[in-house]
Amino acid sequence: MSLPAERSTPRPLHQTDPQALARVVFVLVGTSHPGNVGAAARAMKTMGLSQLRLVAPRYADVCSQPEAMAFASGATDVLAGAQCFDSLADALADVSFAVAVSAEPREFGPPPAAPEVCAAEALASLAQHPEHRVAFVFGAERTGLSIESVQMCHLLTSIPASPVYSSLNLAQAIQILAYCLRREALGGTSVSAHPQDRSLQLPAATVDESPAPMASGAAIQGFFDHLERALLAIGYLDPLHPKKLMPRMRRLFLRARLSAEEV
């Protein structure tokens, strides 16, 4: 009885192209505790992610604090490479697709979608526009993301935890989203496999054979600033009683996934 031929080059388990996740950014807004930043870096690195951005952390030197270094364990390189920004708009300036992670639904916020669907959407966007970046945005430990921060994103996702006790710490939430991204990069899920989880349909332009480059976060913010000034100038927007016009306009245009030439 002959033995089966051995593979000349065994396929490593759970191997994925590192470039598939290299342009995924995790953004932490207003983080208070250095240990959480370190634990976040560790959670990211275990799933092959390395791009960490901090917006107005409580401590400017948070990444070099002993508690952060200790919780990062073997992921101190992710801490060392972390970038700090004064505002979320600055952190998303070169990002063309952003997902807000929040347990609370927000009025006039972006369309909601399950974590695995957001992961699939993000990597699909990178497949069409490999020169771009996508981001997952997390809020402060005690307060989460503000309404204004959520409204800057294209999708909103939440983790379906137990309603009896749904409190996740920051690093746990990051670990789950990072896992969803890695699983998608390994080919473990598909957007089409979860139609019941989807609350939106992609515009036709996103499945075009030659899609136009998506607008960056900076370009989109400039578009909204110009639009607001124009509406004020013609008297359509009352500065004393703006109501919900601009949040509605923001949601409308972000849902359309604007291209660079459209803004």
Residues covered by each model-derived region:
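Post-transcriptional modification and biogenesis factors for structured RNAs
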Residues: 1-263
